[in-house]
Amino acid sequence: MDTTGKVAVVTGAASGMGLAIAQTFADSGMKVVLADIEEEALAGAVSQLSDQGHSVLGVRTDVSKLSDVEALADATIKEFDAVHVLCNNAGVGVGAPVGSTSLADWKWTLDIDLWGPIYGVETFLPLIEEQGEGHINSTASMAGLYAGASLGAYNVAKHGVVALMASLERDLRWRDSNVRASVLCPGP
């Protein structure tokens, strides 16, 4: 897919890997929507990219809330009239073993790390398919492939993300779609 002028949405884009992904997309000629829950960091990231002459939009988004993800999609279409790429990158981690993780920490981790990508896929897939081609990527972790010690909720969420993206890719291929799906599993 030629990326020039295409539109990418990156969650968790205010810092770290998300900002690096947004920077890479922008450098390749894409218009980029940066989404993050941290408003101050998001404003800084948007300034950083726009000061380089890139076409960017920042949208404060809590990916654990479907209404926020839907508002992100609406803002993207309103600003750029299209979306071609979604990168579900927002994530959190709680370092606690199964049996010692509070139910609140389980819910928080699963809401952001698993439900966030689910909301992203379900909200953005129809919009991306309207373009005739595109890509949806979700960031998991090596913990999505191999359970690490004392990372119960994180392991479960990231295994779910790997399964979500494998299921999505299979469904897209079965439908002979020009949209692709992939999962990124960074780790040591």
Language model segments and positions:
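A glycine-rich helix->loop->beta "capping" turn
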Residues: Q52-S55, A75-L86, V94
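Substrate-binding pocket helix/loop in short-chain dehydrogenase/reductase
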Residues: P97-V98, D105-K107
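Residue(s) in the substrate-gating loop at a strand-loop-helix junction
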Residues: S141
